[in-house]
Amino acid sequence: MPKMKTKSGAKKRFRVRPGGTVKRGQAFKRHILTKKTTKNKRHLRGAVTVHETNMGHMAQMLPGQGI
């Protein structure tokens, strides 16, 4: 059986934490920021974790990562 391949787009966008959770960046932060309030942009800072309902998809895209 051949090796399972990691989705190259997923490995650039997600990081697996030691506890098995997956870290991701926030969306809606790249452009068209002038119409967004400062408070809205502030809340989009930093990274968040992938929701547990999407962890099955993460495990398929990132095999061998201990998810």
Swiss-Prot record:
One GO cellular component term noted in the UniProt record for this chain: cytosolic large ribosomal subunit
Start-end of Basic residues biased regions? 1-16
Which keywords has UniProt assigned to this entry? Ribonucleoprotein, Ribosomal protein
Matching Pfam families, A to Z?
Ribosomal_L35p
**Any GO MF annotation of the entry:** structural constituent of ribosome
Q: Where is the signal peptide?
A: none
The Gene Ontology biological process annotation of the record reads:
translation
The record, for Gene3D superfamilies, names: 4.10.410.60
Domain of life from the UniProt record:
Bacteria
Q: Map out region (Disordered) in residue numbers.
A: 1-25
The record ties this protein, via SUPFAM superfamilies, to:
L35p-like
Q: Which PANTHER family match?
A: 54S RIBOSOMAL PROTEIN BL35M (PTHR33343), LARGE RIBOSOMAL SUBUNIT PROTEIN BL35M (PTHR33343:SF1)
Similarity comment text for this entry: Belongs to the bacterial ribosomal protein bL35 family.
| Name of this chain's protein | Large ribosomal subunit protein bL35
- Organism field: Polaromonas sp. (strain JS666 / ATCC BAA-500)
